[in-house]
Amino acid sequence: MNEIQTHIHGVSIRRNFVENLPYNPQLKKLLPGKRKARILSEVLFWQQVRARTFHNIDFDRQRIIGNYIVDFYVKTLGLIIEIDGSSHDEKEVYDGIRQTYLESLGLKVFRIIDFDVKHNLTLVMKELENYIISNYGI
């Protein structure tokens, strides 16, 4: 049975709750600093999704999953949203390892470029809608 989470443009979106995710409590002490860092692209994105303003979907900010802190997490969809800054080869390798691990838990990862959030947020939100529809729509 597919429990409906919400609707986007008339398309029913099914829940995909991933249970028993690993959690490293040692990372909890890092959360206040990350939240206070106020990275502009994260603040702009958060303004679009906080308090269920994006299709009544509940987003968490700075969520610990395993040994990682993800930018945003939608528990009911098992969806991670990561905002990527400027690319460096080392960062890309790290992001790839991290994404492989997160996907091995049954999660999906939607990546956004920092520049796009700052300069074309409307398009970013449309791309997120399309991603959710294509991955969770029924």
What are these regions (language model features)?
Residues 1-56, 135-138:
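Solvent-exposed, charged helical/coil patches
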